[in-house]
């Protein structure tokens, strides 16, 4: 959900297709699905955005899901690195086997996560939960307003972008990476700062004011046209 860099979120039907496909693969080899939910707490439909996880109940015994959760993203505390790997499988034995490996690998690689990050997450999910959810709802609405401005204006001026549903980022579609590089340089010369991704330019609407979102798509389209 809220995919980085496109802002795409898959439907329940798409997840069901993936589960069926992975079960077929599981007939030949063990399969592990890594589901990155770093930005899920900024979904525009927070009440239902986790419903798709129920489809994981249909995984065969040869398929496991690892859900990667980021406290750093959920709490917008990027400097306090903290997260979790949630293991889901049909047998307790399979979960425990992977849990042991994760425990040893994580401990050997990073030791413990910062105490401040753990303390902050505990505080926000208990004592300060209601205040956190209220504040976050305000930011989700602000994010939706910004993304609506950019995508609606992109549609109006013909600036192509990858399918977007929700989240921090919108990615402009540039199939030719050589053109993308020229476009990226031209944007910077006009003080428009984006991130290059494969066959695209990522726009972080999360870091732009609504005012700066207005007219941005049109400016980018005009600059792109001069690069062709």
Predicted regions and their residues:
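Short helix-capping segments at alpha-helix termini
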Residues: 25-28, 58-61, 157
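PLP-dependent enzyme catalytic core of the Aspartate aminotransferase-like
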Residues: 19, 177-228
